[in-house]
Amino acid sequence: DVSIRMNVQTSIALRPADPGAARIELLSGEAAFATAGRSFGVRAADRWILANRAQFDVRYISAGGERPVCVTCLNGELQVERGAELIAMKEGQQLRYDARGESLAAADIEIASAWQRGFLLFRFTPLADVVDEINRYRPGHIFIVNAEIARLPVSGRFRIDRMDEILTQIQQAFDARVRLLPGGIVLLS
């Protein structure tokens, strides 16, 4: 048994698998997977994430022209195939990989899974990264036109169904200027 929860702007494809197994490719976006007693694989970029009894999140989103993959093991154990090698992951670990390599570290499960509860959670995250994430959830686009403000750290919990309230909060917290243009375009300086 497998359950899949897809975040906004997510595309997946079903892939052929052995009998009794399931295989999905995450083409782009973010999805949470849970499997109980069934062999299950998710392909993201050039690797397979393999699970039997686990809950995990896979994120494959363009960031600054790059497309890194981030795998977070929320519960159970995972294996990530890298050629003939397997990288073992356990609950509370996060693997980031791209064409240049990978890094395995402790995960902040609360941040990684916040979207599943209807929130975005940030801890000392540069405003530029916060805006990239906000842009996934609202129509239009926010542009930061001041490089200095882009580096400012943001911490907070924001409701996904109230994305435009974040602009007011950013404006107040950083004394930033917000210019609203037609089509949902926002200039932040």
Stretches with model-predicted labels:
Residues V2-S189:
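A residue-level detector for the "anchor" residue at the start of short, highly conserved motifs
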